[in-house]
């Protein structure tokens, strides 16, 4: 039997963005490359990679009426393609995981290309674009006021470099990506009716302060009120808040942190706005300028995509995101002061009451839990609301005893997407899958909800699996909040 010497997981090889309509003149092929990571690669290599991608896209276009080439698998790499806007292509290149074994005294590499799920990593590629659009707008709109096409391209390249240099450093390790990353899903915090209504009342801020067009509330990393944002925009807001606000102290990045944010995180006593940071020329230190314009984001409200100012307010464990029309004058300090005086007492009281309620629930649940709940063989479940992209699961995503990659890939293949075609497919179905490593996956779909139960039992029969899955469905599907949308 061959001895396993080493296993190399999935890694990011390169990520680049190009547009074939640029650089049409011979000798200007480099203009097609708008962004390339890693940046220290020779220009000729970048041009060759983009040229190869162009050839692949054109070749596959001869076999389908769609202009969307999706993936190319080779022995050592997997390339994922995504065209978010006409002419603009994002390409993600991954190194295939491999196992190095010793056979008859010779090291042999066994590449495991089947472990890479196209659906998971194409979803991550789409999210890379959606986060850019959320913070900067569409590719085609960047520099639209500039009449010179070369200068317009340069402005776009600068924005891409500024955004993706930071975004890729915060990107989740490809080896750890799973079905949750594919779904772009978020978790809502279920509350009792009284607390939920108190949180919902902050939606009336639009009446008290007409400048506010929408508000989103989170408690730690879970959403309390999602407002009228689309699931995709809500996921972008959630990702931005989690990465750039909630985890800012643990991060070594240069994200702006106001004194009020540091105070609200560390002491959890006084609320405050998270303000932007302005770099002062010739000064090594960055300063928070209280007159800085708030961050501008691009979301869809009332079926219209347009820019909004995003104000982020922190009080204890609550984060409140306020959206103001960016077509108007940027908010002045007086508005910040009025909002702070109005919201601080109410949000602080609400945050403390939620914390108290969660503490009581945790104490009650502690007596019912057992240590086997997180074991590798314990039943796992995942429930998905396709329309709101809510999910509920007991997956331990960051622990070593998580689900094997082949199981996650099967779930990704079984999962229905949120697109119109997928949502109009079979309204109800049930599928059971047995894997080679003794896992059973049971999927049920009904009324735009997907339910998965994952069992690990080598001796289980089909009847045993059916009965256990039914028991878990009946036991866990008791939260009406999850199914109300």
Swiss-Prot record:
Question: Is-annotated flag, keyword Translocase?
Answer: no
A single Gene Ontology molecular function, please? guanyl-nucleotide exchange factor activity
Broad class of where this protein is predominantly found: cytoplasm
| The entry's keywords | Cytoplasm, Guanine-nucleotide releasing factor, Transport
Q: Which GO terms describe its biological process?
A: autophagy; endosome to lysosome transport via multivesicular body sorting pathway; vesicle-mediated transport
- Return any one Pfam family short name: Intu_longin_2
GO CC terms: cytosol; intracellular membrane-bounded organelle; Mon1-Ccz1 complex
Deletion consequences:
Accumulation of autophagosomes and reduced number of autolysosomes in fat cells caused by disruption of Rab7 recruitment to autophagosomes leading to a defect in autophagosome-autolysosome fusion. Impaired lysosomal degradation of endocytosed Notch and Boss receptors in the developing eye leading to their accumulation in the brain.
Its subcellular locations are:
Cytoplasm, Cytosol
Summary of activators and inhibitors of this protein: The Rab7 guanyl-nucleotide exchange factor (GEF) activity of the Mon1-Ccz1 complex is autoinhibited by the N-terminal disordered region of Mon1. GEF activity is stimulated by Rab5-mediated recruitment to membranes.
- Respond yes or no to whether keyword Cytoplasm is given for this record: yes
Entries under InterPro entries matching the protein: Ccz1, CCZ1/INTU/HSP4_longin_1, CCZ1/INTU/HSP4_longin_3, CCZ1/INTU_longin_2
The job of this chain, per UniProt, is described as: Part of the Mon1-Ccz1 guanyl-nucleotide exchange factor complex specific for Rab7 that promotes the exchange of GDP to GTP, converting Rab7 from an inactive GDP-bound form into an active GTP-bound form. Required for recruitment of Rab7 to endosomal and autophagosomal membranes to mediate endolysosomal and autolysosomal vesicle maturation. Required for fusion of multivesicular bodies and lysosomes but not their formation or trafficking. Involved in the replacement of Rab5 (and possibly Rab4) with Rab7, also known as Rab conversion or the Rab cascade, during endosomal maturation.
Q: How does it assemble?
A: Component of the Mon1-Ccz1 guanyl-nucleotide exchange factor complex made up of Mon1, Ccz1 and Bulli; the interaction of Bulli with the Mon1-Ccz1 heterodimer is mediated via the C-terminal Mic1 domain of Bulli. Mon1 and Ccz1 form a stable complex which displays Rab7 GEF activity with or without Bulli; GEF activity is enhanced by Bulli possibly by improving membrane association of the complex. Interacts with Rab5 and Rab7; preferentially binds GTP-bound Rab5 and GDP-bound Rab7.
Which family is this sequence assigned to?
A: Belongs to the CCZ1 family.
Q: This chain belongs to which protein, by name? A: Vacuolar fusion protein CCZ1 homolog
């Amino acid at each position: 039997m061959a001895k396993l010497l080493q296993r190399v997981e999935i890694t990011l090889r390169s990520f680049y963005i190009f547009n074939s309509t640029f650089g049409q003149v011979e000798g200007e092929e480099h203009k097609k490359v708008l962004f390339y990571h890693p940046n220290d690669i020779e220009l000729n290599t970048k041009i060759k990679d983009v040229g190869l991608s162009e050839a692949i896209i054109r070749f596959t276009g001869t076999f389908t009426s769609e202009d969307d080439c999706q993936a190319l698998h080779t022995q050592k790499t997997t390339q994922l393609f995504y065209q978010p806007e006409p002419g603009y292509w994002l390409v993600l290149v991954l190194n295939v995981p491999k196992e190095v074994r010793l056979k008859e005294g010779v090291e042999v590499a066994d590449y495991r290309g089947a472990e890479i799920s196209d659906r998971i990593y194409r979803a991550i590629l789409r999210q890379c674009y959606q986060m850019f659009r959320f913070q900067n707008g569409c590719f085609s709109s960047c520099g639209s006021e500039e009449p010179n096409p070369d200068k317009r391209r340069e402005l776009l390249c600068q924005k891409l470099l500024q955004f993706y240099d930071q975004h890729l450093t915060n990107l989740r390790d490809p080896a750890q990506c799973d079905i949750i990353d594919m779904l772009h899903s978020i978790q809502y915090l279920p509350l009792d009716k009284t607390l939920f209504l108190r949180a919902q009342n902050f939606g009336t801020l639009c009446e008290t302060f007409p400048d506010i067009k929408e508000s989103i509330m989170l408690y730690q990393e879970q959403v309390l009120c999602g407002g009228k944002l689309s699931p995709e925009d809500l996921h972008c807001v959630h990702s931005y808040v989690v990465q750039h606000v909630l985890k800012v102290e643990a991060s070594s990045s240069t994200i702006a942190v106001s004194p009020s944010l540091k105070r609200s995180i560390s002491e959890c006593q006084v609320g405050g706005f998270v303000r932007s940071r302005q770099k002062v020329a010739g000064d090594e230190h960055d300063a928070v300028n209280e007159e800085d314009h708030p961050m501008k984001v691009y979301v869809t409200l009332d079926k219209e995509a347009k820019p909004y100012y995003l104000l982020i307010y922190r009080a204890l464990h609550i984060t409140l995101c306020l959206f103001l029309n960016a077509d108007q004058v940027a908010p002045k300090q007086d508005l910040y002061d009025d909002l702070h005086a109005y919201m601080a007492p109410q949000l602080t009281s609400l945050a403390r009451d939620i914390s108290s309620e969660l503490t009581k629930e945790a104490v009650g649940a502690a007596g019912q839990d057992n240590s086997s709940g997180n074991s590798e063989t314990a039943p796992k479940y995942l429930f998905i609301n396709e329309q709101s992209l809510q999910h509920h699961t007991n997956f331990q995503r960051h622990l070593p005893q998580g689900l094997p990659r082949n199981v996650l890939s099967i779930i990704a293949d079984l999962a229905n997407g949120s697109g119109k075609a997928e949502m109009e497919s079979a309204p109800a179905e049930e599928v059971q899958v047995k894997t080679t490593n003794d896992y059973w996956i049971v999927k049920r779909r009904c009324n735009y909800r997907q339910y998965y139960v994952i069992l690990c039992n080598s001796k289980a029969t089909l009847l045993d699996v059916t009965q256990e899955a039914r028991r878990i469905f009946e036991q866990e599907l008791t939260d009406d909040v999850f199914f109300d949308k």
